[in-house]
């Protein structure tokens, strides 16, 4: 539909046509296509002010979609694989003077004074070569019960303990939790223990104990217990004197690989046998 109106003045005559055409025959309304979210574009746009200034006023007034932060995307993707027991230690809201120390967040006594000489001599004593073990991959370690015996000799049974600092973080294959080592009422060290597990949720309970033992071993490192096991020179010499690296075969898959063992042990643990 087209409408026209003619207007004249003293100087000249001007014909003005006012067009009011709603959709002409050659115009087809196309459906609105929903654009896919481009996180890379939005990230560069919101981090580069120059890209904002180059926009026109019309485009600047339109609302832009809010970018998704990295924390939100990571938390949404990992929430399906990471679990927690929600067993965070209770935190006192208003601690009072003289009240028991809350070891979940306290650092009471950390680094205040050294322990007596008789205690230090026990902690820093050289470990017996017969107490050291080696894993098939060549890693030296001291059995967890040895650490507990050294702590009992140094501080006495009941004179030390492990206090949890965080909740247990559980993934499909690993458990971790932070612990604090308390000796004679003082915080000595904080470490996060970890333990891999296989076989489903029924193995979590055993893995939790392994996680606690791993944290104890790491805390004892700050006290100097079995510090030789962290010394590369000692490790090389001890392996040369007390260990052998031999070829072994898996009894079922028949795959061959090199493994470490103690010289005093004549055989390998299942499922490997000496070639």
Swiss-Prot record:
Highest rank taxon of the organism: Eukaryota
Biased composition, class Polar residues, residue ranges: 51-62
Targeting presequence: 1-23
Paired cysteines (S-S): none
Family membership: Belongs to the MGM101 family.
Function: Performs an essential function in the repair of oxidatively damaged mtDNA that is required for the maintenance of the mitochondrial genome. Binds to DNA.
Biased composition (Low complexity): 63-88
Record-given protein name: Mitochondrial genome maintenance protein MGM101
Record carries keyword Cytoplasm: no
Keyword Ribosomal protein (UniProt): no
Localization of this protein: Mitochondrion matrix, Mitochondrion nucleoid
Keywords recorded for this protein, A-Z: DNA damage, DNA repair, DNA-binding, Mitochondrion, Mitochondrion nucleoid, Transit peptide
Stretch list, region Disordered: 51-93
Pfam families, alphabetized: Mgm101p (PF06420)
Lineage of source species: Eukaryota, Fungi, Dikarya, Ascomycota, Saccharomycotina
Entry GO CC: mitochondrial chromosome
Gene Ontology biological process terms from the UniProt entry: interstrand cross-link repair; mitochondrial genome maintenance; recombinational repair
GO terms of molecular function: single-stranded DNA binding
């Amino acid at each position: 539909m087209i409408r026209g109106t003619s207007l004249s003045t003293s100087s000249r005559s001007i014909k003005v046509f006012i067009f009011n055409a709603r959709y002409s025959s050659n115009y087809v309304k196309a459906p609105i296509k929903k654009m896919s979210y481009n996180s890379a574009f939005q990230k560069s746009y919101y981090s580069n002010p120059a890209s904002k200034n180059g926009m026109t006023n019309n485009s600047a007034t339109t609302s832009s979609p809010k970018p998704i932060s990295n924390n939100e995307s990571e938390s949404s993707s990992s929430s399906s694989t990471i679990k927690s027991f929600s067993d965070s230690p209770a935190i006192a809201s208003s601690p009072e003077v003289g009240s028991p120390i809350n070891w979940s967040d306290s650092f009471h006594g950390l680094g205040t004074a050294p322990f007596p000489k008789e205690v230090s001599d026990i902690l820093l004593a050289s470990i017996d070569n017969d107490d050291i073990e080696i894993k098939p991959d060549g890693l030296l370690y001291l059995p967890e019960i040895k650490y507990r015996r050294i702590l009992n000799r140094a501080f006495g049974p009941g004179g030390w303990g492990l206090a949890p600092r965080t909740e247990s973080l559980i993934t499909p294959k690993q458990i971790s939790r932070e612990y604090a080592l308390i000796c004679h009422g003082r915080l000595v060290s904080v470490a996060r223990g970890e333990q891999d597990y296989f076989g489903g949720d029924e193995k979590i309970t055993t893995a939790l104990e392994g996680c606690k033992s791993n944290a104890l071993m790491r805390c004892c490192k700050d006290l100097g217990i079995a510090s030789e096991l962290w010394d590369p020179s000692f490790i090389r010499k001890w392996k040369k004197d007390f260990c052998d690296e031999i070829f072994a075969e898996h009894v079922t898959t028949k795959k061959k690989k090199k493994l470490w063992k103690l010289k005093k042990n004549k055989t390998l643990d299942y499922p490997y046998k000496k070639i």
